[in-house]
């Protein structure tokens, strides 16, 4: 057997895809001398991070949560989007016990069924087809008061694309004979994940008190007014929608509130504001005693009923390393810290034995195009120190820049973001060379390689379905073609001389030349 090297570092360049078309391709236009040199010098290829290869529907773009679950578990994990869509088409959804209990409790109390979530066909945090199924199910079970609190996207969808969704739901409620859109607000407020409670509080007050910056009698009118104020979907101010009598619909005691987002990271904060008795993120004027249900599992400390609990993943990379007595480090900025820990560990919150974690605070700026380098220098300082300490067998690091700046739609800033990451990789590779370590450089999904929508000409702020890079900076080796994210964990185990558990269905991609 070949002697192994340590540490092996996995560098995940978030939102860094490969695209032939160079138009508005921030990765192509960025000056990346380090990656250019590594590509010229070391074995490299492209692997898949989207669609069926990561357990999403065919053609569906990848995302960070899905990417890290596949990277860390070494198998294709069928995602909540796919699971729930299947439950709807199989008619299992309409008899889901947690959802039925919520609707029935509201009906029996003479209350309303409130449904909140990201109203979007994006499929990253939610899918509007799931929200539609929930509205239909509530009415079918006898609910006459059904209120939709719509969070608007513009990030995993074009920046101004919510009108079609809102119009569709207006028509749906007309057809059903009950229900209406009760409020709209941008995801920037409702779905913050960086403890910016001043944002979340606006969504909370909108739903619980009808307290809004604006009030309209129709959701589409509210959206058009937001566009006139130059607010894209993501940033739409809190807008309450009144009924024919000019009344707003607020969450009351005895009501049910069903949160239809299936992705956890941006659902946690607002959920805690609704259900934690000792919540202190902001002052809550009212705390309705209601029946709260989450579509999926958001966090260990969130004890609400769950419609679709997580599937238990055993023998993920982290667990195998623990069981074999290996040491590991997880490191990233705030924005992607959950991804290299919770998601990489298959949805487990607690660190494994021998697993250290380093969290670097992301900069407190309104949007990351204002600071495209983010906290990459500080992150790299800590990463280099960890490498040089020779304390770890395996290091998992995520650089968020390509994704977080890619989401702003600002091409020049995205170029700077890529250049900042390239500089950091240079320092990491140098540190690894010093201690005889190796690294794999890859990504979880694409984003920054496409900064404009070729059809509409609007900024492209969403992820892509492009292949992502896979570079091995280490011993002389060959790389298999046609790999996917789930092949990365088995590859790492093979490189450090550990056997691959049966649960990992991925295949090692790197073959060291003897």
UniProtKB/Swiss-Prot annotation:
One of its GO terms (cellular component) is cytosol. Binds 2 manganese ions per subunit. The gene is gpmI. Belongs to the BPG-independent phosphoglycerate mutase family. It catalyses: (2R)-2-phosphoglycerate = (2R)-3-phosphoglycerate. This is 2,3-bisphosphoglycerate-independent phosphoglycerate mutase. CDD domains: iPGM. Mn(2+) 2 binds at residues 14, 64, 444-445. Substrate binds at residues 125, 155-156, 187, 193, 263-266, 336. Mn(2+) 1 binds at residues 403, 407, 463. Pfam families: iPGM_N, Metalloenzyme. The keyword Nucleus does not apply.
């Amino acid at each position: 057997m070949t002697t192994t090297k340590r540490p092996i570092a996995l560098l995940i360049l978030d939102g860094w895809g490969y695209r032939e078309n160079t138009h508005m391709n921030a990765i192509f236009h960025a000056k990346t001398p380090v990656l250019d040199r590594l590509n010229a010098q070391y074995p490299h290829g492209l692997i898949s991070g989207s669609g069926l290869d990561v357990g999403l529907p065919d053609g569906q773009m990848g995302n960070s949560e899905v990417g890290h679950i596949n990277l860390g578990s070494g198998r294709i994990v069928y995602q909540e989007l796919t699971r729930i869509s299947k439950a709807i088409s199989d008619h299992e959804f309409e008899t889901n016990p947690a959802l039925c209990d919520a609707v029935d409790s509201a009906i029996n109390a003479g209350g309303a069924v409130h449904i909140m979530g990201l109203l979007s066909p994006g499929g990253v945090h939610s899918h509007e087809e799931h929200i539609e199924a929930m509205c239909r199910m509530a009415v079918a079970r006898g609910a006459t008061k059904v209120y939709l609190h719509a969070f608007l996207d513009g990030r995993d969808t074009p920046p101004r694309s919510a009108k079609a969704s809102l119009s569709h739901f207006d028509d749906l409620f007309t057809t059903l004979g009950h229900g209406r859109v009760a409020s709209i607000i941008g995801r920037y407020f409702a779905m913050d994940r960086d403890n910016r409670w001043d944002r979340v509080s606006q969504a909370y007050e909108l739903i619980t008190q009808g307290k809004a910056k604006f009030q309209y009698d129709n959701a589409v009118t509210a959206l058009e007014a937001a566009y006139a104020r130059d607010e894209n979907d993501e940033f739409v101010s809190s807008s309450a929608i009144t009924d024919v009598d000019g009344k707003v619909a607020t969450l009351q005691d005895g009501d049910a509130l069903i949160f239809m987002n299936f992705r956890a990271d941006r659902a946690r904060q607002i959920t805690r504001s609704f259900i934690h008795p000792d919540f202190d993120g902001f002052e809550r004027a009212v705390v309705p005693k209601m029946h709260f249900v989450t579509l999926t599992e958001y966090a260990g400390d969130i004890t609400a009923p769950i419609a679709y609990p997580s599937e238990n993943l055993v023998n993920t990379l982290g667990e195998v390393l623990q069981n074999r007595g290996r040491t590991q480090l997880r490191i990233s900025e705030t924005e992607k810290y959950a991804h290299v820990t919770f998601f990489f560990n298959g949805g487990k919150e607690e660190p494994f034995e021998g697993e250290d974690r380093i969290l670097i605070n992301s900069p407190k700026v309104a949007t990351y195009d204002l600071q495209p380098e983010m906290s990459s220098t500080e992150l790299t300082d800590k990463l280099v120190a960890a490498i040089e300490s020779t304390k770890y067998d395996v290091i998992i690091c995520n650089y968020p820049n390509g994704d977080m700046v890619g989401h702003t739609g600002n091409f020049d800033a995205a170029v700077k973001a890529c250049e900042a990451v390239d500089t950091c990789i240079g320092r990491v590779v140098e540190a690894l060379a010093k201690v005889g370590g190796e690294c794999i450089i890859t990504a979880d999904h694409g984003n920054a390689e496409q900064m404009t929508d070729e059809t509409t000409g609007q900024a492209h702020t969403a992820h892509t379905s492009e292949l992502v890079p896979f570079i091995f900076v280490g011993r002389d080796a060959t790389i298999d073609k046609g790999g996917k994210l789930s092949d990365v964990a088995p590859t790492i185990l093979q490189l450090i001389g550990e056997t691959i558990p049966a649960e990992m269905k991925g295949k090692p991609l790197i073959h060291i030349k003897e």
